[in-house]
Regions:
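Catalytic histidine-centered segment of alpha/beta-hydrolase-like enzymes
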Residues: 43-44, 158-171
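Active-site catalytic motif of lipid deacylating hydrolases and related acyltransferases
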Residues: 1-61
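Active-site nucleophile loop of the alpha/beta-hydrolase fold
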Residues: 8, 37-40, 91-101
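Conserved alpha/beta-hydrolase fold motif
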Residues: 64-66, 91, 127
């Protein structure tokens, strides 16, 4: 699979759990793309969206996106605009802010995400959020769960997951989606032959 990693505010592909995740995914044979988003301390949403566009070109059905924090909102705006070769397999949003009432982040929330468009841009949406996140409260994940008809994966502790160097739930989520269609049916139907 092709896995695209989108970091968040004041971060980079070389911080937090991203280096560990990149290495672990490559060891499993995945193609990993991890763009460095510009001006992470003073971000402008469209600049992040444009960088994602240049890094990915046209996502397809074998693509999985994993984003953290403010990078989740940039990813959703990217998906609104994206020209796709197929519907990405999964969109995994970690500690995603639904709204932040701050002028500094206005470009990410005005205009708001068009959920009616975005919900068709992924085969499934998965929200990963720690219950004790003091930066982006847990109820933000519940809002995304409703708007995207997503699956919410709760983590008991970890805060905003900025100081975490490994996040094993992400590998579990990828492994669960890395199956070849028909693998589970092989034994049950191996003796059936269709004659036309």
């Amino acid at each position: 699979m092709r896995i695209v990693l989108i970091h968040g505010y004041k971060s980079s592909p070389r911080q937090n759990f991203w280096p560990w995740l990149s290495d672990a995914l490559r060891e499993r044979g995945h193609d990993v793309v991890a763009p460095e988003l510009p001006n992470p301390a003073e971000p402008i949403c469209q600049e992040w969206v444009d960088t994602i566009k240049k890094s990915i070109h046209r996502p397809a059905g074998d693509t999985v996106f994993i984003a953290h924090s403010l990078g989740c909102v940039a990813l959703l705006h990217y998906l609104e605009q994206a020209d796709m070769a197929g519907t990405p397999k999964a969109i995994i949003l970690i500690s995603a802010p639904f709204h932040i009432a701050s002028e500094r982040f206005a470009s990410f929330f005005v205009p708001p995400v068009d959920f009616e468009t975005v919900m068709w841009k992924g085969q499934e949406f998965i929200l990963v959020h720690a219950k004790d996140d003091a930066v982006i409260p847990f109820d933000h994940a519940k809002r995304y769960e409703q708007e995207l008809n997503g699956a919410l994966k709760e983590i008991e502790t970890g805060g905003h997951l900025m100081d975490v160097t490994e996040l094993s739930i992400l590998l579990d989520l990828i492994d669960d989606r890395n199956t070849v269609p028909g693998d589970s049916l092989h034994d049950d139907f191996s003796d059936i032959h269709v004659v036309l």
